[in-house]
Amino acid sequence: MNILQISFHTSPFGSIGKFDSGGLNVYVQQISKQLSNENNVTVVTAEKAENFKTDNLDFYSLDLFEPGLSVDDKEIHLQEFKIKLEENFELENFDIIHAHYWLSGLVAKQISEEKNIPYIFTSHSLGIFLEGYNKERVDLSLIHI
């Protein structure tokens, strides 16, 4: 199976404890490593980081912003990230997309609808909801439980 992992806002292979690096990073890193034992896994981030390839695990940074940028300032790069994904990867070759954090989920949903690729979304945080409902930021009708 060919799996695309999207971690838009932070590099899962970055230094833990710096900037936005924490539990999400550890989770994406470890699940990607485990899945690569029996699958081909491609992990993509928008945060600047060093690319690498191993047997069944490839990591790519699309270099859209430096580590440490606030999440609010990262949002403006979402559409550019999606365009770069389409330019740099044959998305049709992925069997499934796993999106991490709500920003990645927005991109995965668009790709899923356009390319008919199933996707999984893991929130990792409910912080956006704790800040209060903001219609411009989140369309709650997209959330199905």
Where in the sequence are the language-model features?
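A short, flexible beta-alpha/helix-coil linker loop
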Residues: 9-14, 65-69, 128-129
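Short acidic, glycine/proline-rich loop/turn micro-motifs
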Residues: 14-18, 70-72, 131-136
